Amino acid sequence: MCMLTQENVINFLRHNPALTVSTLEKEAAIPKGTVAQTLAGTRNLSEKHLTALFPILSKYGYSDSLYEKARVISIINHKGGVGKTTTTSSLGEALARRGFKVLLVDLDPQGNLSQILGVDDPQSQVAQALLNHGTPLPVIEISENLFLSPSDIELADAEIQLILSVGGDLRLKNKLQPVLGQFDYVLIDCPPSLNKLTISAMNASNSCLITLLPEMSAVKGLNSLLQRVMEVKTNLNADLVVDGLVFTMVKKNTVHEGIKENVKSSVPFRVFNTEIKHLVDFQKSQILQSPIAKFSDNSEAAKNYRDFCDEFIQYLQVVK
């Protein structure tokens, strides 16, 4: 029996937008429009269709192990105010719109991510799951394909207990395991420091994404951040990789241009081409505690993150 499922076909094609559906149908010798209608949700693939598609998709890089579990990504920086939470919420929303099932984990005691998504006073939150063995990670549906594990200031007390507890670094990883099969992506919004919570997040992750404001005050701590990533990789999570760095709050001036070029020439990993510009809509959406796409879906700010999402998806397919 063919191991390929309709869900995996859809996931693979969403991760590979360059593949032409009509070409796949022709190579697999299945009726024209079969795959296109499946992507549109108007029909289902039969076992015969899946069997015919399997060798064709395999030729283009498909394997059964690609989408067994979610890819867990920590969004990190040692400094606050560099667009980390905005990137987490906006990237998650953009992925969800493309049909991927996304879980956002608020691991910042300030709870800004939860507040942006309209969860101001969570009754069940991440801290309770981390401190109590029998308590599962809370998962709240925010919108279609987008879910949240919320937090507030209670998480600060939890961090102190995690520092003192045996296996504290493993708590988040263990709590995520039961839900990984339900999602395509898990994005963790880390606190603006290199503390126990950030280490726990990286230990639970496949990779991390760095957000960086191109100003000296933000760039100065980049080496310390990368050193901490290497410490986690060496001592806790050998599979951890850096997906890359995305510049945020970018202004069109010579100072930002010079800093960006310096960073690009010095870091040993990808710097994404898409930059998140310094736009007033980002500030307005933060004041109103609203995701940028909900605040102004047609704005340049929302388009900025949709473009980054497209580039990020293309990158993920390459590394897989």
Feature roles, as predicted:
Residues 6-7, 12-15, 22, 32-33, ...:
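P-loop NTP-binding core
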Residues 26:
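Alpha-helical residues within the helix-turn-helix
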